[in-house]
Every structure is written in C-alpha cells, then in structure tokens.
Amino acid sequence: MIQMEVLGGSVSWPFAIPPGRSNPDGVPPRVAELSAKTTSWRLSAWRDAASNAIGIAINEQAISIDVGHIKALSVCFMRRAKGPGFVSFEARMLETRGTVVLFAADHFNEDALRWLEGNTDKLAALFGMPIAIEDCGLDY
C-alpha cells in the first residue's frame, strides 16, 4: 500500500532535491503520475509499505530511500552570517553514519524553515518515524 501527502509550498523559497540525488526509478508509478500533475513548487511525499521505502518528489525530481537504512530524519538549518545558510530535510543513515539531503533550500529563509517545521508532524506520521529539529548555528 502506498500512502501519499502533497504539501503546499511557495515559489519564493523553492526547495529542491540536490543535484545528482534524484533517482526516479524508485518512485512508484502512481506517485510519479500524481506528482507530475502538481505544480512545481508543491512537495509530494510518500511511503510504500510493499518496498519499505519513503520518498520525496518536487519539480519533476524524486528521491527514495529504504526505511531500513535510515537511523533518523531531521530538519536542519543554518542561519545566515557570512555565508548564505540553508534549510534542509535530511536522513541520517545507519551503515555509513552519513546523511542524505532529501531536499533543501540553498540559503536560509525564515518562512521556509517555518513551513518545514509546520509540516514535520505530517511527514513524521507519513514516514512512521520522528523528525528532529537541528539548529546548526550561524554560517561563518
């Protein structure tokens, strides 16, 4: 069974899947069809119980990850200082101890952070795991 949630967004702070991370092969056909019909700034999230995968689609790109490989999910942000900062949604992986950025805004934006924080309950319920909020400080 596939569960899906389409979340509103804003063209003023577009989130994107990082370059080179999109893997449309892992997207269930029905999700790909529905995501293609949404406006480019809306974010589609899904969980596929059959493949035990979660995923994100936005602006004709998608990324999916097997839930069994995920240690934790988090909203990360770094406020502007000398650098631009960022707002991201990340998965911390079990095997590599690394993180995979599922989607991000490449510069800090308070509205983008508020939107993502406001949708963490929906994403946590859909993905079946808690989502931490991580303040990474200032971008020096």
Model-derived regions, located:
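Intrinsic disorder/low-complexity detector
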Residues: 1-140
